[in-house]
Swiss-Prot record:
One of its GO terms (biological process) is translation. The lineage of its organism: Eukaryota, Viridiplantae, Streptophyta, Embryophyta, Tracheophyta. This is Large ribosomal subunit protein uL22c. This protein binds specifically to 23S rRNA. It comes from the Eukaryota. GO terms for molecular function: rRNA binding; structural constituent of ribosome. Belongs to the universal ribosomal protein uL22 family. The keyword Metal-binding does not apply.
């Protein structure tokens, strides 16, 4: 089996729940509703959905946010669920005793759920910095050179 190398990310945290006794299909039905949403919105959705699989996923999202605030110092208002995936786990097999000395097998499916939260405040600051860098003549008012848009047509470098 090939293992993926995890890149060290400075803006994301994750929580992993393993061997949760739930079918992967039922867990994916809930996970698809919260993927890409903000942390607070996801908690509200999970509290109001009527499925049994919401509670373990709610605990995982809450745990990932606690990891973000405790380990990296992120604010919970800036967190977004960037990645949420459900993988199939082991199937727990039991025997149910029946009449006349017989037994029926019972299969309990399990799943592994991974929730990744990202801090979007870093990206907003990065976009502001890029906007600041796009107009190089405008950031120094001491210069006497005119400020041209770098991507506009009709600038001094467009002439042949």
């Amino acid at each position: 089996m090939i293992k993926k190398k995890k890149k060290k990310s400075y803006t994301s945290v994750y929580a992993l729940g393993q061997y949760i006794s739930m079918s992967t299909h039922k867990a994916r039905r809930v996970i698809d509703q919260i993927r890409g949403r903000s942390y607070e919105e996801a908690l509200m959705i999970l509290e109001l959905m009527p499925y049994r699989g919401c509670y373990p996923i709610f605990k995982l999202v809450y745990s990932a946010a606690a990891n973000a605030s405790h380990n990296k110092g992120f604010k919970e208002t800036n967190l977004v669920i960037s990645k949420a995936e459900v993988n199939q786990g082991n199937t727990v097999k039991k025997l149910k005793p029946r009449a006349r000395g017989r037994s029926y097998p019972i299969k309990r499916p399990t799943c592994h759920i991974t929730i990744v939260l990202e801090d979007i405040s870093f990206y907003q600051q990065y976009e502001e910095y890029l906007m600041y860098l796009k107009n190089p003549g405008c950031r120094n008012e001491k210069r006497n050179l005119p400020c041209y848009e770098t991507y506009s047509s009709g600038g001094p470098w467009d002439k042949k």
